Every structure is written in structure tokens, then in C-alpha cells.
């Protein structure tokens, strides 16, 4: 296994640990016996290419690994991955009401905002969209985890700071769980470029 793959899989495992421990998934009861009827817990993931397995073999992204981790711990939850590569917070906001109605999730993970930054969109709009999505999920009786992102320094110190902080504000204002930086341990390590695909945005899982 190459270094990039190992780093990415390790990161996925750590993210899964965080979501289980801090994202409300630890509260899911394990099955006492194999014959028990599993309760209906549904985890809805609304994200972009980082969650949609863009450029990766099916079943190797962090969402699939989280599903495997929950199964390993005998936590009977179904994960619905409604992520779309290239999606923005505006796109997610427009899609979320129908997703909530269709799946009636017990938990919602919001991994959006990166493409807003790549397109230079107004961060006030990004924050408003994430806040609206969080509020909608809470009103649907779901526990919410907001997944934060960061942008490189070349975006400007002020923009990078404001972008990072908007996720914190949304989570704090709505009392949602927060993953401060989705790519911590991947994008912030020396020579991080080797851990990414050619677009230098999405982590690389392929052997070199």
C-alpha cells in the first residue's frame, strides 16, 4: 500500500472515530443478539466530492468506511450518501428539504462549503446556507454534525480566517457537533501534494 493510500485510509478511520464519538453516533445502541430487530437509525450525508468518492474506487471513501465501522461496532445504522461532486452550499440547501422528507434521518452530516471558497463566493451566503441547512435538519429531529474546511494561504489571510470560522459559528449557534477541519492530517502535513489527486483538491486513494 502506498503512502497516499495509507494516509487517506488512516484519516478516514480517524474521522469515523470522531463522528462516532462526538457526532451523536456513539448513542446508537449495539444489538444485543443477532436476532434482535434493529432500530431504524439513518445517517444522511450531504456533501461534495470529498464525500462522493470522486476519483476513488467505490466503497473506499470515508462514508463507506464509516458504515463499515458502525457495522463492526454492531451499531445498526443505514448511511445515505447524498453527496454530489462540485456541489455548493446553495445546491445542498435546495436539495436538503426533499432528502429530509424522503429519508427522515436521525443524524445529518453536512460536508459542504469547499466549492463555495473555490468559486470565491460571498462567505455570508455560505454561512447563511449552512445555518439554514442545520436548522432544517434540527427541525426534522435529526442530530447534526457540521464538517469544517480550510483554504490555502494564497486565498488571503482574512478570507482563510473568515472561511474557517464560519463553520465554528454555525455549529455553536445551533449547538451542532463540529469537525473543525475535514482534511486535518492530510492537507496540513509537509509535502501534502503527494496525498492528493491531480486536481490537488480530493485525497488520493489510488496506488502510484
Predicted regions and their residues:
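Acidic/histidine-rich helix-loop elements
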Residues: 55, 80-89, 118-121, 200
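Short gly/ser/thr-rich secondary-structure transition/capping motifs
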Residues: 28, 90-93
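Serine-esterase "nucleophile elbow" of acetyl-processing enzymes
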Residues: 31-85, 95-104
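Short, solvent-exposed loop/helix junctions and linker helices
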Residues: 2, 40, 60, 202-205
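N-terminal secretory signal peptides and thylakoid transit peptides that target proteins
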Residues: 1-19, 23-28
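Generic low-polarity alpha-helical segments
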Residues: 5-9, 33, 67, 203-204
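Alpha-helical cap/lid subdomain in secreted, periplasmic
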Residues: 65-75, 93-208
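Intrinsically disordered, low-complexity proline-rich regions
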Residues: 13, 39-40, 171
Amino acid at each position: 500500500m502506498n503512502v497516499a493510500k495509507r494516509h487517506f485510509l488512516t484519516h478516514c478511520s480517524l474521522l469515523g472515530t470522531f463522528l462516532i464519538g462526538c457526532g451523536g453516533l456513539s448513542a446508537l445502541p449495539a444489538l444485543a443478539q443477532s436476532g434482535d430487530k434493529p432500530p431504524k437509525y439513518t445517517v444522511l450525508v450531504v456533501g461534495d466530492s470529498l464525500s462522493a468518492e470522486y476519483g476513488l474506487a467505490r466503497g473506499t471513501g470515508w462514508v463507506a468506511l464509516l458504515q463499515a465501522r458502525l457495522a463492526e461496532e454492531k451499531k445498526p445504522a443505514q448511511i445515505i450518501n447524498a453527496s454530489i461532486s462540485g456541489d455548493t452550499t446553495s445546491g445542498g440547501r435546495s436539495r436538503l428539504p426533499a432528502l429530509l422528507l424522503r429519508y427522515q434521518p436521525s443524524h445529518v452530516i453536512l460536508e459542504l462549503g469547499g466549492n463555495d471558497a473555490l468559486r470565491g463566493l460571498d462567505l455570508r451566503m455560505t454561512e447563511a446556507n449552512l445555518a439554514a441547512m442545520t436548522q432544517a435538519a434540527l427541525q426534522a429531529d435529526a442530530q447534526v454534525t457540521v464538517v469544517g474546511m480550510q483554504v490555502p494561504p494564497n486565498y488571503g489571510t482574512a478570507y482563510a480566517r473568515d472561511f474557517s470560522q464560519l463553520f465554528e459559528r454555525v455549529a455553536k449557534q445551533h449547538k451542532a457537533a463540529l469537525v473543525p477541519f475535514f482534511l486535518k492530517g492530510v492537507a496540513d502535513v509537509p509535502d501534502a501534494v503527494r496525498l492528493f489527486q491531480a486536481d490537488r483538491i480530493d485525497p488520493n486513494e489510488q496506488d502510484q
